């Protein structure tokens, strides 16, 4: 038996064994699979979300892998103000752990977990960075109603008519006026506007100063075949006109000779 035949038989046996082992693994995995409960499915979805955030963070991260590695969230639960300093990946990790606690019995939440949840929703970070009274008993600065409420009657009854409160616009509250001020622009927008105006003025001045002499020359591409064809047709027309004129002249000349002969 040659070496090529031995090699072919060995490859055939190896491929058959590999296929048999993969088929057995697939059957075992299929038998061991079971339907996940809603809690387990939610946990698996959270794991996939964290893994996706890790993958995205690893793509945009130019430093070490510490920025995409899980962190110890205990200091964040103890001091909620640290949440605003975390990157997007670590904030997602904290939110995931906090959501897992919220999905369970709310009565078992600790004060630290409640404070962290309140800080994430109403704390002085991001759009609410100037809300410095988040950890006090005072009402939020943009509360949509007055505190304390104005009572019209000292002894209200069940049949009293209740009137609608006057609307309170959040954009007019003192802490929100600067955020909703549309007359101001950020430096980046101003820079782009100034660059656009400069380019427009430069283009207008250049158009005025350049005039007709600076206009770009139009390149006309001539078709030599078509040009020669038109010239040939023009010559043929001229030749036909000349021939027709010559015939008319001969006709008139013969007519003159005829009239003279009659006289």
Swiss-Prot record:
Its main location: mitochondrion. The keyword Transmembrane applies. Residues 1-26 form a transit peptide. Keywords: Membrane, Mitochondrion, Transit peptide, Transmembrane, Transmembrane helix. One of its GO terms (cellular component) is mitochondrial membrane. It holds the Pfam family COX4. The chain crosses the membrane at residues 188-204. SUPFAM superfamilies: Mitochondrial cytochrome c oxidase subunit IV. Residues 232-252 are annotated as: Disordered. It is a single-pass membrane protein. It is found in: Mitochondrion membrane. Belongs to the GEP7 family. Involved in respiratory growth and required for cell survival in the absence of prohibitins. This is Genetic interactor of prohibitin 7, mitochondrial. It comes from Clavispora lusitaniae (strain ATCC 42720). The gene is GEP7.
